[in-house]
Amino acid sequence: MGIFRGPNIVRDGLTVLLDSRSSRSYPGTGTTWYDLSGNDNHGTLYNFTGPSAGSTSGFDTTTKLMMYDRHVGTSDGTANNYVRIPNSDSLDNCLITNGMSISFWFRQDVYRCTAMTKWNSSWEVYYCSSLVFRTQGTGGSDLNTGDTALSGFHNICVTSTSTGRKVYVNGVVQATGTNTVSTQNTTSNVSIGAYDGGAYAMEGSLPYYALYNRELTSDEVNQNYNALKSGFGI
């Protein structure tokens, strides 16, 4: 699938672009969520029960949002819905040691400690009262925003170079820190909405996900935020 020409978002370094509101990305049925970046990093939907109008566990045909419904009480996460992007050569360019950025739109409908996205042994973004950008591998550590209330849709963006990293919410820097990762694992899948396998799943909506193979500047983070915010009621 060729690159999508939509809103005026930053495209330099774009490695994954999933947007359930676009029929080119999710046609309204099936288990494939198509990558619009042109790199064929398509997502596979696991345990989603939609599509249907008002769905809380799949594609909502009314709002065009991808919905996630954590099944409370399942200890192993196998009933929870999540998205898996298989490892690829282009994803391997999104290591912390190379420089990378993730930008996604997120709405939590019920408070849960949740993994928004994770690349096992490489990086993770999760929310449990505060936003945490975790780097993994040799020298990995957590960058924590402190108490951060998230109600309604928010744009979360994390950026990293080989030496530093930042967390943004709606275009505003919430935390900065150093980065000392020296080696990372590059064989795992990228997951959205939970760990790969369904643990620490979210309950709400994450309909837009973009991954870059470089650090976005603050101006670029704001360009993406401003290009998309009206579509999320901001």
Describe each model-derived feature in a short phrase.
Residues 132-155:
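Short, aromatic/His-centered strand-loop micro-motif at the edge of beta-sheets
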Residues 28-29, 33, 37, 46, ...:
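Extracellular glycan-recognition modules
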Residues 170-190:
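Short, solvent-exposed beta-strand-to-loop segments that form ligand-recognition rims
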Residues 1-2, 89-90, 136-144, 186-207, ...:
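Extracellular glycan-interaction patches encoded by glycine-rich segments
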Residues 91-93, 143-148, 179-180:
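Beta-strand-rich interaction surfaces with strong enrichment in secreted/lumenal proteins
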Residues 152-166:
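Localized edge beta-strand/strand-to-loop motifs within extracellular or lumenal beta-rich domains
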